[in-house]
Every structure is written in structure tokens, then in C-alpha cells.
Amino acid sequence: MLDLKRIRTDFDTVAAKLKNRGVSEDTLTHLKELDEKRRALLVQSEELKAERNIASAAIAQAKRQKEDATQQIADMQKVSADIKTIDNQLVAIDQQVTDIITVLPNTPHDSVPVGADEEDNVEIRRWGTPRDFDFEVKAHWDLGEDLDILDWERGAKVTGARFLFYKNLGARLERALYNFMLDEHIKEGYQEIITPYMVNHDSMFGTGQYPKFKEDTFELADTNFVLIPTAEVPLTNYYRGEILDGKELPIYFTAMSPSFRSEAGSAGRDTRGLIRLHQFHKVEMVKFAKPEESYQELEKMTANAENILQKLGLPYRVISLCTGDMGFSAAKTYDLEVWIPAQNTYREISSCSNTEDFQARRAQIRYRDEADGKVKLLHTLNGSGLAVGRTVAAILENYQNEDGSVTIPEVLRSYMGGETVISPK
């Protein structure tokens, strides 16, 4: 959530930054007008309360002296009625301010490229060279069926579209991947966490999914619970409402969890395969950092995600998302896109973001600065390290062989009991 004081004092800068994120200046102007009206009413309310206190003291004195206080009482009752009217107006204005400010996206960092959509994203670097196949490559969904390791038909029967069963070495490959990912992140100083897979609505508000993106989630009927769309939500909210010791920062968390997404706006997109599912495993990284260190921590987090792809030998590129393509809470985002041979393109496999104090303000996560003793909002960062199902897809396609088998990447073999290849039955 943005700082209302910043909007008030640096309106033109905030308006210009949010314009690049598709927010109309009229919206901010309306918010500013509401804020000005609210502040004026607060002044009136305080003046009337002071007047009421004086009148109350005068009435008490008149009664002690057995004087007639009828007029003073009538005057005080009118003042009290005026205060109530103003307070009701303030409640209504506060709600309007909340309705606007809670759906405003974060302001982009100055280094973020300006653009309308993914076509305006900027490639930063590439790693690895896509393999030159001398046979016709298969898509990962066909490989999965031919190898009897992915069962889409029964997934659809048991649950519905965009669900599947992992079987045999497919299940072991998935498990090997997330164990490998967690182990690599732990080496980099991340604390492993097993989170709840359901969170309450306050947690969804804290990380920015609510109220704007409710339709993208699975809520449990007649409860305050939501299935997590990413472990970012419980990990970030771990410290919601707390004040941390500045000497402890930065703090690194990692967790593997299922992620549940309705994919409300994705009808007709990626209807086959592991790219877009309602339920999938993902290893998440979350950081809590001091403001002056957060962008250095973003670079480190991105490198941690890249490390996984490099050790798996998967070609990828790093993209800096433009203002029009970033997520709601992000101030800056790097996407990692892995090479998918059957599609002859790169597809997103990780997204690493610095939200600055946007989530921390919503969730009230603060720290006490050891330098001056003041309590301040910290910065939160999050990143995929990696989306496990998409990594399975990338391995199946990049490591496929002409005979229909798939070679298991060397770094995963110790996690799979020494298996070196997945062969057709």
C-alpha cells in the first residue's frame, strides 16, 4: 500500500509513476481531494470537541453555583450533534480513501523500463545455448504420457481440467527437484519453513492479493480461509504486525508448497501441459531487508534462482519487466524464462521482485533501526526458486532423446536413487 503522506506531499511524482502503471491521474486527484476534506473535518472535529469541553466545564460550574445552565446544555448538545455529524462524514470518507488506496499498485523503481505490456520488457542477459536437436522434438505432455509418468486423463476425471497425476519416475523427478532446490537455497543462508497451506483474509491483504485479486483465488466457503496462491503469502505474513530487531536483518526464508490458482483470466491459454495449472508445487524465497540494502538483495535473490537453472543445465534468459507488466505489489521485477524446445521459445519459470515497503505497510512489518532507535518499515522481497512443474516440463523437453527416453540431469541423480534415464515402458 502506498503512503498517503507521500501522495499528499509529492503528488506529481507519484502521479507520473502510477500513470506508467495504468492509473488515471483523476483517481489520484480524487484521493487527494478526499484526504484534504478529511483533514479539514478532523480540524473542525477537534475544535468542536475543545468547545464542548469548555461548555461542559461551564455547565459543571453553573450547577455548583446553583445557576441556570439550560442554555449552556442546549448549546453543548448542538455541539455534540455537530461532532457526531462530522464523525459520520469522516467514517464515510475514510472508507472511500481505503477503497482507493488499497487497489493502487506500487510505484515502479526508477530503473524499471516504461512500457505497456510484455512486448516492452527488456532482456538483461542469457545463459546457455538451446540444444540443436537432430530429430523432431516432442512436447512435454506427450513425453509424460509416453513415459507413463504424467496422467492427464485421470487428473481430469478425478478433479477437472488443469489437474494431473505424477507417477513413477515422474513423481520422483518432481520430489527430487524441490528437494534439490531447497538444499541449494539453504546453502545460501535461507531458513527452510513449512507453512500452512491456508491463510486468512488479513494475510491475503498483507501481501496485496486482496482486495483486488479475489477472483484469482480459491476461498473456502463460509470460512475466513483461502488456499494459498503462493508460499509468499504465509512466509511474508510470518512477521505481520511485528517489530524486528534491525541487527537481525536481512532475514531469508524458503519454502516448498502447493500453490492454488483459479487462473480466472487464462481461458484458452496453455490448456495442455504443466505451464498453467490450478495446483502446482513451487519453491519460494522471501526476504526481509533494510531499505538501503533491498536492491542488492534483489540481485542476490535473482542469482539464487539462476543458480538452480545453471546447475540443471537449462538455457534461460533474464527479463526486466516494464511498468505495464509488473505485478501489483512489485517496485521492480526480474523474470527468469527457461527455454522450451517444443514451443521454440522461452517461458517464465521464476519471478523475483522487490516490493519495497508496499507489503510491509499493508502488513505492518517494521524494524527498530539500531543506528537511531527509530521504528521503520522494512522492505520485503519474494521470488520463485523455482516453479517445480515448469522445471519438470523444461527437463523433459531439453533432455529428451531420439528413442523417446529422457536423461536425468546429473545433479538430480543422487535424489533419485542413482537413476540416470527415464525410459519408455
UniProtKB/Swiss-Prot annotation:
Pfam families membership: Seryl_tRNA_N (PF02403), tRNA-synt_2b (PF00587)
Record keyword ATP-binding present: yes
Residue positions binding ATP: 261-263, 348-351
Gene Ontology CC: cytoplasm
Top class in the EC scheme: ligase
A GO molecular-function annotation: ATP binding
Domain comment in the entry: Consists of two distinct domains, a catalytic core and a N-terminal extension that is involved in tRNA binding.
Subunit structure: Homodimer. The tRNA molecule binds across the dimer.
The protein's Enzyme Commission number: 6.1.1.11
Protein residues bound to L-serine: 230-232, 284, 384
Subcellular location(s) per record: Cytoplasm
Family that this chain belongs to: Belongs to the class-II aminoacyl-tRNA synthetase family. Type-1 seryl-tRNA synthetase subfamily.
Keywords from the UniProt entry: Aminoacyl-tRNA synthetase, ATP-binding, Cytoplasm, Ligase, Nucleotide-binding, Protein biosynthesis
Gene3D superfamilies in the record: Bira Bifunctional Protein, Domain 2, Serine-tRNA synthetase, tRNA binding domain
Taxonomic classification: Bacteria, Bacillati, Bacillota, Bacilli, Lactobacillales
GO biological process terms, semicolon-separated: selenocysteine biosynthetic process; seryl-tRNA aminoacylation
Source organism of this protein record: Streptococcus pyogenes serotype M28 (strain MGAS6180)
Catalytic activity: tRNA(Ser) + L-serine + ATP = L-seryl-tRNA(Ser) + AMP + diphosphate + H(+); tRNA(Sec) + L-serine + ATP = L-seryl-tRNA(Sec) + AMP + diphosphate + H(+)
Protein name per Swiss-Prot or TrEMBL: Serine--tRNA ligase
Pathway linked to the protein: Aminoacyl-tRNA biosynthesis; selenocysteinyl-tRNA(Sec) biosynthesis; L-seryl-tRNA(Sec) from L-serine and tRNA(Sec): step 1/1
Role summary: Catalyzes the attachment of serine to tRNA(Ser). Is also able to aminoacylate tRNA(Sec) with serine, to form the misacylated tRNA L-seryl-tRNA(Sec), which will be further converted into selenocysteinyl-tRNA(Sec).
InterPro entries registered for this protein in UniProt: aa-tRNA-synt_IIb, aa-tRNA-synth_II, aa-tRNA-synth_II/BPL/LPL, Ser-tRNA-ligase_type_1, Ser-tRNA-synth_1_N, SerRS_1_N_sf, SerRS_core, tRNA-bd_arm
